[in-house]
């Protein structure tokens, strides 16, 4: 995921190096930066597809799962929501963009991640209570450019996420 402009050069450089050394690996990039650039990717972003195979824009949990299923199956990328890819030299955009049902998403799973190596005095994990912004009027903010409707996760699901993450990962700090 590339979620800020400061990550673009390093993220695309990493994609370039992986593709150069292992061209058979399918590289997908997601994140809010490319969500804001959907029109640019569609119109003149074809050069990025020299080292990135696809972009997942807007919300990505279900699209990423569908992409993995298609790459393991028949490879029909038209079946993957929120995906931008190049096929036969043409940039394809799978619209309409799908919105996640936040209350159907499971508690995040951080198993296998080296949480003790993160540079923080205490373990801190993310918990999602909502996406988008209910107001969308701040002149300095880029959230409205994501074109995402504000939607929330039920309070009982968020509380369950806190409890589960606290017990499973011995975490008392969340953002």
Question: What are these model-predicted stretches?
Answer:
Residues 96-102:
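A short, sequence-level motif marking secondary-structure junctions
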Residues 44-47, 97, 125, 145:
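Short, functionally important structural connectors and interaction interfaces within domains
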Residues 1-95:
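Glycine-rich beta-alpha loop elements in corrinoid/cobalamin-binding modules
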Residues 103-175:
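Radical SAM [4Fe-4S] cluster-binding motif and immediate context
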Residues 76-78, 98, 120-122:
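A generic structural signal for short, non-catalytic loop/turn and secondary-structure boundary residues
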């Amino acid at each position: 995921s590339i979620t800020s402009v400061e990550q673009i050069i390093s993220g695309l450089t990493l994609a370039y190096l992986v593709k150069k050394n292992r061209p058979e690996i399918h590289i997908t990039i997601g994140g809010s930066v490319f969500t804001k650039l959907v029109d640019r990717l569609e119109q003149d972003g074809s050069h990025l597809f020299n080292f990135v195979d696809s972009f997942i824009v807007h919300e990505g949990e279900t699209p990423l799962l569908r992409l993995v299923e298609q790459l393991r199956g028949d490879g029909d990328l038209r079946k993957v929501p929120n995906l931008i890819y190049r096929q036969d030299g043409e940039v394809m955009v799978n619209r309409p963009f799908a919105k996640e049902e936040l209350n159907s998403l499971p508690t995040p799973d951080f198993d296998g991640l080296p949480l003790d190596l993160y540079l923080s005095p205490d373990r801190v994990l993310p918990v999602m209570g909502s996406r988008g912004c209910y107001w969308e009027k701040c002149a300095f903010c880029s959230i409205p450019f994501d074109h995402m409707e504000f939607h929330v996760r039920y309070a009982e699901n968020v509380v369950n996420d806190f409890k589960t993450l606290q017990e499973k990962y011995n975490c008392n700090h969340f953002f």
